[in-house]
A protein has these predicted regions:
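Secretory-pathway/membrane protein signature
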Residues: 1-273
């Protein structure tokens, strides 16, 4: 990895199995911040090679299956042709069964046309088109206010702060989009881009975590999952304790074992000489 790329490179485009048909549609998987730009890009596409029966879609966030995740958390906004759908990854990928039988000419051409046009669209921008509004909204959606209340954490203030951050981020994105469309002065384009790339690194450091299975999540999600598991364990322990108490106290009494039930919970008496 090149540390000097951080703050300079506006996009990393990764290609994984671009000649393999994954599901019924092509998908561009990206960080949350590029989603709005990519969806706008899809709206203005010309007719491309028909590699799939359904239209191309955008999905987020980046997954840990490929190098673009490492590049994203290093501070470079990344995207990849989504390749994790279907059973191929579990049964054929990186094995002797991964051969030219699965080469699809139309899918290959579609991915090259799609990402070639995308590369040119990104290159035409004056300001990196990152929108952090979606990131903050997703962070809010992942916040469990019930657990915040039960642990006396100020979840409401955090949710409000995320709403305000999302609103401000949308205004900044609208400003960048106007510059990129030539509808606003671009004297501060360079400064704005540097600020956005710096913010991208900060959001990656602050909001991106992975769980034991490599799934990407927000920091609070792992804590909330731990609380749920601990709560469930405590409930189970209480339930088992109740069962043990019932077994030791009630059943012996029902069978006439009153003396046995009492002796189980009192120290044995010394034998008389």
């Amino acid at each position: 990895m090149h540390p000097e790329w951080r703050g300079q490179v506006i996009a990393d485009l990764n290609f994984e199995l671009p000649a393999l048909a994954h599901g019924t549609r092509a998908r561009i998987r990206s960080t949350y911040e590029y989603v709005d730009f990519l969806e706008e890009f899809l709206e203005n596409l010309p007719e491309l090679t028909q590699g799939y029966p359904e239209e191309t879609r955008i999905t987020a966030p980046i997954e840990t299956w490929s190098d673009d995740f490492s590049i994203a958390i290093a501070g470079i906004p990344s995207m990849v042709n989504d390749f994790t759908g279907g059973s191929f990854m579990e049964t054929h990928y990186h094995s002797q069964f991964d051969n030219d039988t699965y080469y699809d000419e139309d899918v290959y051409r579609l991915h090259h046309e799609l990402f070639g046009l995308l590369l040119m669209a990104i290159d035409r921008t004056r300001v990196v088109p990152l929108n952090f509004a979606g990131t903050f909204q997703k962070a809010k959606e992942a916040l469990d206010l019930d657990w915040c209340a039960r642990t006396e954490a100020d979840g409401e203030s955090l949710a409000q702060a995320l709403d305000e951050a999302a609103e401000l981020a949308q205004q900044v994105y609208d400003r960048a989009a106007a510059i990129n469309r030539g509808q606003a002065p671009d004297e501060d384009a360079g400064r704005l881009e540097r600020q956005l790339l710096n913010l991208f690194q900060q959001t990656q450091d602050t909001f991106v975590r992975i769980d034991w299975y490599g799934n990407v999540q927000f920091p609070q999600e792992s804590l909330q999952q731990s609380l749920e598991l601990l709560h469930g364990a405590a409930q189970l322990a209480y339930f088992l304790l109740q069962l043990v108490q019932r077994a030791l106290y009630i059943r012996p009494l029902e069978t006439g074992g009153r003396r046995l039930a009492l002796e189980l919970f009192s120290p044995p008496k010394a034998r008389q000489a």
